[in-house]
Amino acid sequence: MKQKILIRIAMTDDTTRAKAMKTAVQFKGVNAVEIKGDHRNQIEVTGVEVDMIALINTLRKKVAFAELVSVAKVEPPKDGDKKPEEEKKPEEKKPEEKKPEEKKPEPCCQPWQKPEPCYQPWPHDGYGVPSSYPYPCDPYNQIGEPVYNQDPNCRIM
């Protein structure tokens, strides 16, 4: 849900206004910030699902005293509200230019995958646990051990 939030902040100079706008723009969900009001002491924040309480608390901490003035839901324009000039103009059909398909280069390296250890089965004869249980079948394929020069043609840039 897109909404407009009007916040009054104790701003007296351009430095404070810039700091307030910068703080508001960095907040999650904010799309646009405008300075409003007769004394340029209000900002209008437009965004999708903006947490206004957290925004006001952040502005209070970083800039100056801030208070919520109003919150309004922004409705998208309806299709029936189109200008009549747009409906009268015939649509010109332009021939579509075919773009050559872009081929993605194949990666030179395979992504790293964690090797699965292979363990010897548990002895079911009841005589205890072997001294080196569990041990991997291949001692060179241990988990966490780096593999050097796996593909010599691969370059990391």
Curated annotation (Swiss-Prot):
InterPro entries: HIPP47/16, HMA_dom. The keyword Metal-binding applies. Residues 73-115 are annotated as: Disordered. GO terms for molecular function: metal ion binding. Coiled coil: none annotated. The modification Cysteine methyl ester is found at C154. Residues 75-106 have a biased composition (Basic and acidic residues). A lipid is attached at C154 (S-farnesyl cysteine). Residues 2-71 form the HMA domain. Keywords: Lipoprotein, Metal-binding, Methylation, Prenylation. Residues 155-157 form a propeptide. Belongs to the HIPP family. Probable heavy-metal-binding protein. This is Heavy metal-associated isoprenylated plant protein 16. The gene is HIPP16.
